Amino acid sequence: MIPKNTKKIIIYLLRNLEIVNINQISKNLEISVGSAFKILKELEKNNLVLSSNLGNAKFYQINLNNEETIKWCEILLSEERRNLKGYSKIYAEEIQKFEHSELIILFGSVLNNKDFNDVDVLFITNKPKEVTRFCLNLSKIRTKPVVPLILKKEDFIKEIKNKKEVALNILKTGIILKGESALLK
């Protein structure tokens, strides 16, 4: 069992691609600096996070070159999906059934509002027609329409490298429904 604050820190570092210092981590996650320091020291010792010194501050980022880190991240991302509640869980179970996609991320208002107008989903695939057909069929059975954002893998990688706000927001706030390992690669 992974402690709650350790989970928070690993997920935060995974979702925020830039390097961050301990004060940013503790402020954004509402964890004491001492607790964050202790956790990060342990994660660094186990080679799950990398640190670098810039001036007087130490900056951290997730170590995705370590197989153990990737396994931890996959488990934590799967746990996030399992902990979905309400409408987001209902839609997630249906959307996960789509087979022609490497990566599926649920994002937007469905995750945090009871009053949502549509269900936003990112599909990483080379088969846009199948996605459109699937989403139209799902929209017919459910009360709210499923709005797909369809990208090819190369385009999504380019969006992230170019720090496009939409792609980064999806990574920061979205729930991975399928393809945790594809995301981590």
Question: Which residues does each predicted region cover?
Answer:
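Catalytic core of pol beta-like nucleotidyltransferases
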Residues: 1-100, 111-116, 125-185
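Short acidic amphipathic segments
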Residues: 101-107
